[in-house]
């Protein structure tokens, strides 16, 4: 459960990301594909090379979903319901992949914002990404 301090940390950190969210989303996806090659199986139609337009576009989608989640941090299930349906019923993404992407998002944010990435912010973002992952996998059976 996200505490008030966690929510404040997440909002403050995400606010500093600003216009770089899509760039960081794409970088985190690239890290995920490199570090966890089995994740590539969900994107057989993508050009997964560094900087590809398809990875950039999907990175922006990831960033947009996380931006929406931050904006609705007190009601993640309703905010992410459509995305949860998509991943559970249509895409059927293995839930472990959300953990992989979450880890790569943390690494990416730490690389770009080391001064803001305190232990408290790290813990808050980790809890937030975990909460988002839980919502996205809540409709799996």
UniProtKB/Swiss-Prot annotation:
UniProt-listed SUPFAM superfamilies: Globin-like
GO BP annotation list: hydrogen peroxide catabolic process
Assembly and binders: Heterotetramer of two alpha chains and two beta chains.
Originating gene: HBA
Task performed by this protein: Involved in oxygen transport from the lung to the various peripheral tissues.
Keyword Transport: yes
Keywords recorded for this protein, A-Z: Acetylation, Heme, Iron, Metal-binding, Oxygen transport, Phosphoprotein, Transport
Residues modified as Phosphothreonine: 108, 134, 137
Residue positions, PTM Phosphotyrosine: 24
Protein name: Hemoglobin subunit alpha
Assigned protein family: Belongs to the globin family.
Phosphoserine modification, residue list: 3, 35, 49, 102, 124, 138
Domain Globin: 1-141
Listed GO MF terms: haptoglobin binding; heme binding; iron ion binding; organic acid binding; oxygen binding; oxygen carrier activity; peroxidase activity
